[in-house]
Amino acid sequence: MAEAVAQPVETVAHTFAPKLFNKWSYDVTVSDISLKELLAINSKLKYQVFLPHTAGRYQIKPFRKIQCPIVERLVCCMMQHGKNSGKKLLAMRVVEESFEIIHLLTEKNPIQVLVDAIINASPREDSTRVGTGGNAKRQAVDVSPLRRINQALYLMTMGCRSAAFRNSKTLAECLADEIVNASKSNTASFAIKKKEDMERVAKSNR
């Protein structure tokens, strides 16, 4: 019988790589340089989790939510609003099922597809009101990288919820369709349509 060979602790720690839901690797690339440090995927080992539930208190300081793994942020967005609020286990099951569907549709790593969808669905330009009262007017402004991620997640989850309402498709199927379409910059995606509307309005207010 062969004897077990002990490995140094450093070697074991270096080779250890968790997988999301014990299936999907975190070995993904972020093509947008401005979002690379804010997506919290593989820049640090603590972002690579088996389950998207870290029980972190990300609300106690501004900008602390950039330390929240991006898949967990998607799960938290799925808990909005109404009857799904607070049901994180349900939201995690929906995201896991949608990732399975994404893998079947694209034969790619679902985390990579999600990252591409966030990059494509995040608006780069928006408009805001400048002035007070009767002198107020709309002014085009650049969108910060953190708000780009927030907007992309919000628009994708809002689109899949509205698509699943009074529809034979499940919420997981609608979420998978939304993410796949957004990753391809397809206008069938609710988030892509909203992003283009926002950028068109901003362009007219330059």
UniProtKB/Swiss-Prot annotation:
This is Small ribosomal subunit protein uS7. Component of the small ribosomal subunit. The ribosome is a large ribonucleoprotein complex responsible for the synthesis of proteins in the cell. It is found in: Cytoplasm. It comes from Entamoeba histolytica (strain ATCC 30459 / HM-1:IMSS / ABRM). SUPFAM superfamilies: Ribosomal protein S7 (SSF47973). Keywords: Cytoplasm, Ribonucleoprotein, Ribosomal protein. InterPro entries: Ribosomal_uS7, Ribosomal_uS7_CS, Ribosomal_uS7_dom, Ribosomal_uS7_dom_sf, Ribosomal_uS7_euk/arc. Component of the small ribosomal subunit. GO terms for molecular function: mRNA binding; rRNA binding; structural constituent of ribosome. One of its GO terms (cellular component) is ribosome. The gene is RPS5. Belongs to the universal ribosomal protein uS7 family. PROSITE patterns: RIBOSOMAL_S7. One of its GO terms (biological process) is translation. NCBIfam families: PRK04027.1, uS7_euk_arch. It comes from the Eukaryota. Pfam families: Ribosomal_S7.
